[in-house]
Swiss-Prot record:
InterPro entries (UniProt xref): AB_hydrolase_1, AB_hydrolase_fold, HAT_MetX-like
Gene Ontology CC terms, in alphabetical order: cytoplasm
Protein name, per record: Homoserine O-acetyltransferase
Gene responsible for this protein: metXA
Function description: Transfers an acetyl group from acetyl-CoA to L-homoserine, forming acetyl-L-homoserine.
Residues covered by region (Disordered): 55-74, 403-433
Biological pathway: Amino-acid biosynthesis; L-methionine biosynthesis via de novo pathway; O-acetyl-L-homoserine from L-homoserine: step 1/1
Keyword Transcription regulation among record annotations: no
Record flagged with keyword Metal-binding: no
GO MF entry, a single one: homoserine O-acetyltransferase activity
Length: 433
């Protein structure tokens, strides 16, 4: 397979005033590009909550390595490599792909873990050199504005498309709302115009897990010899992973299988938790082992304060803000839209994407809502390239008339308009026991 030019860097964009009214004197945005710019072939990819600018693999091996706060690992490293690349759905031999780490994150863009200017006047001076919780509150709107600033810096005007999944899909919707004249097509995958109450509740518990960790120390855990709140961050991530999987996929992957009775007598993973008092009698199950494994890896690569900031940005996003309805918010957009949803995703449901499709249709925007029958849950947009790729590829080339693009016909909440489910759309059981 042929290689394509890739580039990466950190752009210093000058003073940036956030939607909250607070500012940083020089916003730095870490970015990556793939392909060659020909003037009208730019596809902006918006990463999900804990993703990074490293959307696809680079021909340079050192670009595919990294550790917390500087490089990428796990989902953050080449997190959509099955979709972005030569000959793939977002074909980097045709498109100039740009992906930028969002403000508030920790992969090179300015965020809580970044060094703050020494001459910065703060009401309470932290005893370390990082922004910490003095960093301004971040919103999805700030992500879109920082991306527009970065594209201006790169000499890019109008975009062929903006593509993203999960909260990255919210980022996409904000582009259609805020910069309707700057983009031809938008692709919002597994997303919604706002979170529902159940997701808000789970995110709140995740943030409390971090804040309850004594090592969080009010967000002031930076500096030599200070332990990070890894236990709290790990628990927060475990809550997230439960949200990302469907009931059916968890049963298929793990069931009630034991990972070994002896495992629970040790401290659980490296999370610092004491063993359960009943550990000698009951099994340590595979689903617990999976959650511990995911949590340990995540704590090594992500910043706890960034998790607080980014989940709050996701929670607070409302597409209709400043407008009466979602349709009003999208009224100025004159391009085409593709929405993709997954039948077993209870984090961002099929119904929520149907509602967005209705909002686009209300403003006569050509739109398709492509529903994928999958039991993978919210993670499907990352792990099912064979289903995500074809409609995405054809939409970028042909719009809503693309051969692999289907539409639910505006079925909305009518189950007869899409494949039958084998799961409950809401995990009420997560609030029990």
């Amino acid at each position: 397979m042929s290689t394509v030019p890739t580039d990466h860097g950190v752009a210093a964009l000058g003073e940036f005033v956030f939607e909250c009214g607070q500012s940083v004197p020089d916003l730095e945005v870490a970015y990556e590009t793939h392909g060659e710019f020909d003037g009208d072939n730019v596809v902006l990819v918006c990463h999900a909550l804990t993703g990074s600018q490293n959307v696809a693999r680079s021909p340079a091996p050192e670009r595919n390595e990294g550790t917390r706060g500087a490089g990428q690992a796990g989902q953050a490293r080449a997190w959509w490599d099955d979709i972005v690349g030569p000959g793939k759905a977002i074909d980097t031999t045709k498109y100039y792909v740009v992906c930028a780490n969002v403000p508030g994150s920790c992969y090179g863009t300015t965020g809580p873990a970044s060094e703050r200017p020494a001459d910065l006047d703060l009401p309470e001076e932290p005893d370390h050199d990082r922004w910490g919780t003095a960093f301004p509150p971040v919103q999805v709107e700030d992500w879109a504005r920082s991306q527009r600033r970065l594209l201006d810096h790169l000499g890019v005007g109008r975009l062929r498309a903006v593509v993203g999944g999960s909260v990255g899909g919210m980022n996409v919707l904000e582009w259609a709302k805020r910069y309707p004249d700057d983009v031809d097509r938008v692709v919002a995958i597994a997303t919604a115009g706002r979170l529902d109450a159940q997701c808000l509740a789970l995110d709140a518990v995740a943030r409390r897990a971090i804040r309850a960790d004594p090592n969080w120390n009010g967000g002031n855990y930076y500096g030599e010899g200070r332990p990070s709140p890894d236990e709290g961050l790990a628990l927060a991530r475990q809550i997230g992973h439960i949200m990302y999987l469907s009931k059916a996929s968890m049963e298929r992957k793990f069931g009630r299988r034991s990972a070994g009775r002896d495992s629970l007598t040790r401290e659980e993973g490296d999370l610092g938790l004491p063993p359960e008092p009943t550990a000698a009698f009951f099994p340590y199950r595979e689903v617990e082992s999976y959650l511990d494994y995911q949590a340990e890896g995540f704590s090594e690569r992500f910043d706890a304060n960034s998790y607080l900031y980014l989940t709050r940005a996701m929670d607070e996003y409302d597409l209709s803000a400043g407008h009466g309805t979602d349709a009003d918010a999208l009224a100025a957009f004159e391009g085409e839209a593709l929405l993709m949803s997954f039948t077993a995703d209870w984090h961002f449901t099929v119904e929520q994407s149907s509602s967005l499709a209705a909002a686009f249709r209300d403003r006569d925007v050509p739109v398709a809502h492509h529903v994928i029958d999958s039991d993978h849950g919210h993670d499907a947009f990352l792990v099912e390239p064979e289903h995500v790729g074809p409609p995405l590829r054809d939409f970028l080339v042909e719009g809503v008339g693309g051969r692999a693009v289907s539409d639910d016909g505006g079925g909305g909440g009518n189950d007869s308009a899409r494949p039958e489910r084998d799961h409950a759309p809401v995990h009420a059981s997560l609030f029990k026991g």
